[in-house]
Amino acid sequence: LMWRVAQREAKTLFLILFDVDYFKQFNDMYGHQAGDDALAAVAKCIGDNIRRPLDHAARYGGEEFIVVLPDTTPEGAASVAEIIRSAISDLGIEHSGSEFGHVTASIGAATWTPEEDSEVSAVIRVADEALYAAKATGRNKVELSPVHTS
Protein backbone atom coordinates (compact mmCIF):
# COMPACT_ATOMS: atom_id res chain seq x y z
CA LEU A 1 0.00 0.00 0.00
CA MET A 2 2.73 2.52 0.93
CA TRP A 3 4.45 1.67 -2.35
CA ARG A 4 1.38 2.71 -4.35
CA VAL A 5 0.96 5.88 -2.29
CA ALA A 6 4.61 6.83 -2.90
CA GLN A 7 4.19 6.24 -6.63
CA ARG A 8 0.92 8.16 -6.84
CA GLU A 9 2.18 11.12 -4.79
CA ALA A 10 5.69 11.02 -6.35
CA LYS A 11 7.41 10.78 -2.96
CA THR A 12 10.59 9.02 -1.91
CA LEU A 13 10.25 5.75 0.00
CA PHE A 14 12.89 4.07 2.18
CA LEU A 15 12.92 0.34 2.99
CA ILE A 16 14.95 -0.88 5.95
CA LEU A 17 15.58 -4.61 6.45
CA PHE A 18 16.64 -5.93 9.86
CA ASP A 19 18.08 -9.37 10.51
CA VAL A 20 18.78 -10.65 14.03
CA ASP A 21 22.44 -11.68 14.10
CA TYR A 22 23.24 -15.36 14.76
CA PHE A 23 19.58 -16.16 15.40
CA LYS A 24 19.86 -19.85 14.48
CA GLN A 25 22.61 -20.21 17.10
CA PHE A 26 20.40 -18.34 19.60
CA ASN A 27 17.56 -20.84 19.03
CA ASP A 28 19.98 -23.78 19.28
CA MET A 29 21.46 -22.49 22.57
CA TYR A 30 18.39 -21.14 24.35
CA GLY A 31 15.47 -22.97 22.73
CA HIS A 32 12.63 -21.93 20.48
CA GLN A 33 10.53 -20.34 23.22
CA ALA A 34 13.41 -18.04 24.13
CA GLY A 35 13.84 -17.35 20.41
CA ASP A 36 10.17 -16.41 20.09
CA ASP A 37 10.47 -14.17 23.15
CA ALA A 38 13.58 -12.49 21.72
CA LEU A 39 11.83 -11.87 18.38
CA ALA A 40 8.81 -10.41 20.19
CA ALA A 41 11.12 -8.06 22.12
CA VAL A 42 12.89 -7.02 18.91
CA ALA A 43 9.56 -6.43 17.15
CA LYS A 44 8.33 -4.27 20.03
CA CYS A 45 11.61 -2.36 20.05
CA ILE A 46 11.31 -1.63 16.33
CA GLY A 47 7.69 -0.53 16.70
CA ASP A 48 8.54 1.67 19.67
CA ASN A 49 11.19 3.49 17.65
CA ILE A 50 9.27 4.46 14.55
CA ARG A 51 7.47 7.69 15.23
CA ARG A 52 5.50 9.01 12.29
CA PRO A 53 1.94 7.82 11.60
CA LEU A 54 2.73 6.55 8.07
CA ASP A 55 5.91 4.65 9.06
CA HIS A 56 5.24 0.90 9.16
CA ALA A 57 7.08 -2.10 10.57
CA ALA A 58 6.40 -5.79 10.01
CA ARG A 59 8.02 -9.16 10.40
CA TYR A 60 9.40 -10.03 6.98
CA GLY A 61 10.21 -13.67 7.60
CA GLY A 62 12.09 -15.79 10.10
CA GLU A 63 14.22 -13.37 12.08
CA GLU A 64 13.89 -10.55 9.55
CA PHE A 65 11.85 -7.38 9.89
CA ILE A 66 11.08 -4.59 7.44
CA VAL A 67 10.39 -0.92 8.09
CA VAL A 68 8.84 1.31 5.43
CA LEU A 69 9.54 5.03 5.77
CA PRO A 70 7.61 7.11 3.23
CA ASP A 71 8.80 10.57 2.23
CA THR A 72 12.12 10.16 4.05
CA THR A 73 15.60 11.43 3.25
CA PRO A 74 18.62 9.11 3.32
CA GLU A 75 19.82 10.96 6.43
CA GLY A 76 16.45 10.48 8.13
CA ALA A 77 16.37 6.78 7.26
CA ALA A 78 19.95 6.32 8.47
CA SER A 79 19.05 8.01 11.74
CA VAL A 80 15.97 5.81 12.28
CA ALA A 81 17.95 2.67 11.41
CA GLU A 82 20.77 3.57 13.80
CA ILE A 83 18.36 4.42 16.63
CA ILE A 84 16.67 1.04 16.21
CA ARG A 85 19.97 -0.84 15.88
CA SER A 86 21.21 0.73 19.10
CA ALA A 87 17.90 0.09 20.89
CA ILE A 88 17.96 -3.60 19.91
CA SER A 89 21.51 -3.90 21.24
CA ASP A 90 20.48 -2.06 24.42
CA LEU A 91 17.75 -4.64 25.09
CA GLY A 92 20.60 -6.67 26.59
CA ILE A 93 19.16 -10.07 25.65
CA GLU A 94 22.01 -12.45 26.47
CA HIS A 95 23.47 -14.31 23.49
CA SER A 96 26.71 -16.14 24.22
CA GLY A 97 26.85 -17.30 20.58
CA SER A 98 27.47 -13.73 19.43
CA GLU A 99 30.75 -11.87 19.65
CA PHE A 100 28.77 -9.00 21.21
CA GLY A 101 27.43 -11.18 24.06
CA HIS A 102 23.83 -10.12 23.44
CA VAL A 103 21.23 -10.01 20.68
CA THR A 104 22.06 -7.54 17.90
CA ALA A 105 20.77 -6.84 14.41
CA SER A 106 22.34 -6.10 11.06
CA ILE A 107 20.49 -3.58 8.94
CA GLY A 108 20.33 -2.77 5.24
CA ALA A 109 18.42 0.12 3.71
CA ALA A 110 17.52 1.24 0.21
CA THR A 111 15.54 4.07 -1.28
CA TRP A 112 13.06 4.37 -4.10
CA THR A 113 12.65 7.74 -5.78
CA PRO A 114 9.76 8.93 -7.96
CA GLU A 115 12.07 9.06 -11.01
CA GLU A 116 12.45 5.28 -10.95
CA ASP A 117 10.30 2.83 -12.81
CA SER A 118 11.18 -0.21 -10.72
CA GLU A 119 9.03 -2.61 -8.76
CA VAL A 120 9.10 -2.89 -5.00
CA SER A 121 10.91 -6.24 -5.32
CA ALA A 122 13.90 -4.43 -6.87
CA VAL A 123 14.17 -2.07 -3.91
CA ILE A 124 13.83 -4.97 -1.46
CA ARG A 125 16.65 -6.76 -3.33
CA VAL A 126 18.90 -3.68 -3.00
CA ALA A 127 18.09 -3.36 0.72
CA ASP A 128 18.84 -7.08 1.12
CA GLU A 129 22.22 -6.59 -0.57
CA ALA A 130 22.97 -3.76 1.87
CA LEU A 131 21.92 -6.04 4.75
CA TYR A 132 24.33 -8.73 3.59
CA ALA A 133 27.08 -6.11 3.30
CA ALA A 134 26.41 -5.16 6.94
CA LYS A 135 26.71 -8.81 7.95
CA ALA A 136 29.87 -9.33 5.88
CA THR A 137 31.61 -6.33 7.42
CA GLY A 138 31.07 -7.09 11.08
CA ARG A 139 27.34 -7.29 11.93
CA ASN A 140 25.48 -5.08 14.41
CA LYS A 141 25.65 -2.19 11.98
CA VAL A 142 23.64 -0.19 9.45
CA GLU A 143 24.51 -0.26 5.75
CA LEU A 144 22.73 2.12 3.36
CA SER A 145 22.76 1.30 -0.31
CA PRO A 146 23.68 3.99 -2.79
CA VAL A 147 20.62 5.64 -4.34
CA HIS A 148 18.78 2.83 -6.11
CA THR A 149 18.42 3.03 -9.85
CA SER A 150 16.18 0.78 -11.90
What is each residue range found by the language model?
Residues 14-16, 58, 108-110, 143:
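Conserved beta-strand cores of small sensory beta-sandwich domains that regulate signal transduction
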Residues 68-70, 110:
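Short hydrophobic/aromatic beta-strand micro-patches
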Residues 59, 88-105:
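Catalytic core regions of nucleotide second-messenger enzymes
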Residues 74-82, 96, 112-150:
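Catalytic-core segments of nucleotide cyclases and related cyclic-nucleotide turnover enzymes
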Residues 3-15, 24-48, 58-62, 66-67, ...:
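Conserved long alpha-helical elements within nucleotide-processing catalytic cores of c-di-GMP signaling
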